[in-house]
Amino acid sequence: MFNPNNGSEFARNRARLDDTPNPYEPEVGSLPEGDRSQAGSDTVNKTGTTIVGLTTQDGVLMASDMRASLGGRVISNKNVQKVEEIQPNAALSISGSVGGAQSFIRSLRAEANLYEARRGEYMSIDALSTMASNLLRGGPFFRVVPILGGVDDDGGHVFSLDPAGSSMSDTYTAQGSGMPYALGVLEQEYSEDLTMADAEQVAAHAVKSASERDTASGNGIHITKITHDGLTTVGHKEFDALL
């Protein structure tokens, strides 16, 4: 049997393969050269954002600013609604890439609608958070950091999620570039016995404080109220009427 050696034209030694791509790369634990997730980040619409979610005696209140930016430097839109209904008793607020957010919302809403069609009832908020987490973890990479809020038979729920698929429940939370400023206000002013009206004032104060210091947040606020009766979202360009 012919045994190729280094001098044979049939030999496949390492020297001859130096310029040939390795079909087995990248290996587990290695990354492609460069951070491709950041490619073109300066031209991608982002909701730099301050978003907050609070549980109340009456349900859940979610709030977000209205600004979208390009690369965190240029304001590309001053009237973005960052809270979207997923089902009549649940909503999702988004910080991060606008395109990723829109795609993720469509996917989660489709799954919720499919569940309702099959079961004849809305998905529980805990199950909805698990579905959202699974989509983030197992689907395409979404550069988004959402807050999920909703009301079911067990009361009001607020969940923080991240692009890696984690899901954490809390009585209040904040996300986005303005999170440090908003959380400071929530830590001082939140209490578990808040009414919806009280929570509206606290959330407005949190978003306003973030908007004053975070260049990627501002241009007004959307307030979303979720109760057993349904979901409503109202936009305000000024904070004075809410404080």
Swiss-Prot record:
InterPro entries: Ntn_hydrolases_N, Pept_T1A_Psome_bsu_arc, Pept_T1A_subB, Proteasome_sua/b, Proteasome_suB-type. Its EC number is 3.4.25.1. It is found in: Cytoplasm. Residues 1-48 form a propeptide. Pfam families: Proteasome (PF00227). It is an enzyme of class 3 (hydrolase). GO terms for cellular component: cytosol; proteasome core complex, beta-subunit complex. One of its GO terms (molecular function) is threonine-type endopeptidase activity. It comes from the Archaea. The active site is at T49 (nucleophile). Transmembrane segments: none annotated. The formation of the proteasomal ATPase PAN-20S proteasome complex, via the docking of the C-termini of PAN into the intersubunit pockets in the alpha-rings, triggers opening of the gate for substrate entry. Interconversion between the open-gate and close-gate conformations leads to a dynamic regulation of the 20S proteasome proteolysis activity. Residues 1-46 are annotated as: Disordered. Its main location: cytoplasm. Keywords: Autocatalytic cleavage, Cytoplasm, Hydrolase, Protease, Proteasome, Threonine protease, Zymogen. It catalyses: Cleavage of peptide bonds with very broad specificity. Signal peptide: none annotated. The keyword 4Fe-4S does not apply. One of its GO terms (biological process) is proteasome-mediated ubiquitin-dependent protein catabolic process. The 20S proteasome core is composed of 14 alpha and 14 beta subunits that assemble into four stacked heptameric rings, resulting in a barrel-shaped structure. The two inner rings, each composed of seven catalytic beta subunits, are sandwiched by two outer rings, each composed of seven alpha subunits. The catalytic chamber with the active sites is on the inside of the barrel. Has a gated structure, the ends of the cylinder being occluded by the N-termini of the alpha-subunits. Is capped at one or both ends by the proteasome regulatory ATPase, PAN. Component of the proteasome core, a large protease complex with broad specificity involved in protein degradation. NCBIfam families: arc_protsome_B (TIGR03634). Belongs to the peptidase T1B family. This is Proteasome subunit beta.
